[in-house]
Amino acid sequence: MNHLTTETRNIQTMHLDEMNLSDALKTMNQEDQLVPKAIEPVIPNLTKVIESAIQRFNNGGRIIYIGAGTSGRLGVLDAAECVPTFNVSPNDIIGIIAGGQKAMTVAIEGAEDDAEQGAQDLKNIHLQSKDIVVGISASGRTPYVKGALVYANKMNAETVALSCNVHSDISKNSNHVLEINVGPEVLTGSTRLKSGTAQKLVLNMISTMTMIGVGKVYDNLMVDLRPTNQKLIHRSIRIIQDVCDLNHQEAIELYEKSDHNIKIAIVMHLCSTTQQDARLRLKQNNGVIKQAINT
């Protein structure tokens, strides 16, 4: 492991324990600022990943994140957030963590070293060739993730390796390679820091841009959100008010007439049509508002 960048000592923090608190925080902040720039070189590869994810999602495939420890938790987090944000099923975007759900809050000893379980966890969700599997591992050598990617390849699923070391092991088992070289961690080997931040940013990009590509966004608005609480209900009404140029009360009335569906409300108003017709237009255009209003 000595050759791994994530295990190398950071020369900026060699005496971290002797720094005063303010200087230590400034140093940590400076190191964190390196992360977004480290992602920039992989944007061409990331573009191909997202294009594939859009195509597969539109053909009934799923996006599956799989990892161990911090990497696994980040995948589960991103998948979970997609349900209310984009009104997708929990079965459309899935996060799997080594050791199961208990591992979200408690470290499960040895879980990351079980390559066979990585494959088994994909078998348990009935992996299909139309799915895309994103293996997440800061080191790029986690056996659990390697096992999952090897199995995914056998099933002819699309595979993506997301790591924070160049020439990583998991990259050898994937169709797409995303290697984010964030450099040594502030605290040597603590990949929950810069590596975790990089992984979170990349997962944000994958899920957000894929959902835009499948019609879940109008301009920069979350028009397919699931209004499950008061905050989201108010946001839904504000979106309708903004897009349709209505006052607050008019937006509320349209929201009610649309059966609490932002997309339907927008199409109803912009096309001066009924709820039934708006629903049909959206269905015929895969839920993409701008296509529906031009039909």
UniProtKB/Swiss-Prot annotation:
PROSITE patterns: GCKR (PS01272), SIS (PS51464). Residues 53-216 form the SIS domain. The active site is at E81 (proton donor), E112. Belongs to the GCKR-like family. MurNAc-6-P etherase subfamily. It is an enzyme of class 4 (lyase). One of its GO terms (molecular function) is ether hydrolase activity. Its EC number is 4.2.1.126. One of its GO terms (biological process) is amino sugar catabolic process. Homodimer. NCBIfam families: N-acetylmuramic acid 6-phosphate etherase, PRK05441.1, PRK12570.1. Specifically catalyzes the cleavage of the D-lactyl ether substituent of MurNAc 6-phosphate, producing GlcNAc 6-phosphate and D-lactate. InterPro entries: Etherase_MurQ, Glucokinase_regulatory_CS, MURQ/GCKR, SIS_dom, SIS_dom_sf. CDD domains: SIS_Etherase. It catalyses: N-acetyl-D-muramate 6-phosphate + H2O = N-acetyl-D-glucosamine 6-phosphate + (R)-lactate. It comes from the Bacteria. It comes from Staphylococcus epidermidis (strain ATCC 35984 / DSM 28319 / BCRC 17069 / CCUG 31568 / BM 3577 / RP62A). This is N-acetylmuramic acid 6-phosphate etherase. Keywords: Carbohydrate metabolism, Lyase. Pathway: Amino-sugar metabolism; N-acetylmuramate degradation. A lyase-type mechanism (elimination/hydration) is suggested for the cleavage of the lactyl ether bond of MurNAc 6-phosphate, with the formation of an alpha,beta-unsaturated aldehyde intermediate with (E)-stereochemistry, followed by the syn addition of water to give product.
